[in-house]
């Protein structure tokens, strides 16, 4: 198995556990140049809030979308949008990525923004 397959396998296990709980989840996806976050309802069929470094208003604030600073901006933004949608508590789905660097920065910024994990 290569690195990507291992990550996806890890992600599948995590998502299965979160699906059993039927809780709202905050899922993160990252590439070398961008980071994306979505708040998805318990059934997994509806996106309640989304934020990413691809958006024009976020891109105008940042010189680079693939660093910790960008992840913090996206974390604060997703927390604001989730609270506006009526979501206070989420399960954190890191999609198999290590809880380190940009993923950790996004999670901490979302917590500071008022989301409970």
From Swiss-Prot:
InterPro entries: Ribosomal_uL18_bac-type, Ribosomal_uL18_bac/euk. The keyword Ribonucleoprotein applies. Keywords: Ribonucleoprotein, Ribosomal protein, RNA-binding, rRNA-binding. SUPFAM superfamilies: Translational machinery components. GO terms for cellular component: cytosolic large ribosomal subunit. This is one of the proteins that bind and probably mediate the attachment of the 5S RNA into the large ribosomal subunit, where it forms part of the central protuberance. Belongs to the universal ribosomal protein uL18 family. Part of the 50S ribosomal subunit; part of the 5S rRNA/L5/L18/L25 subcomplex. Contacts the 5S and 23S rRNAs. This is Large ribosomal subunit protein uL18. It comes from Aromatoleum aromaticum (strain DSM 19018 / LMG 30748 / EbN1).
């Amino acid at each position: 198995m290569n690195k990507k397959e291992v990550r996806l396998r890890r992600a599948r296990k995590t998502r299965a556990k979160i699906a059993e709980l039927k809780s709202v989840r905050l899922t993160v996806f990252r590439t070398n140049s961008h980071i994306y976050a979505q708040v998805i309802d318990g059934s997994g069929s509806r996106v309640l809030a989304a934020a990413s470094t691809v958006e024009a208003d976020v891109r105008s604030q940042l010189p680079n979308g693939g660093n910790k600073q960008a992840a913090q901006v996206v974390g604060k933004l997703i927390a604001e949008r989730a609270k506006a949608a009526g979501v206070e508590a989420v399960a954190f789905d890191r999609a198999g990525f290590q809880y380190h660097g940009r993923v950790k920065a996004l999670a901490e910024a979302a917590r500071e923004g008022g989301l409970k994990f």
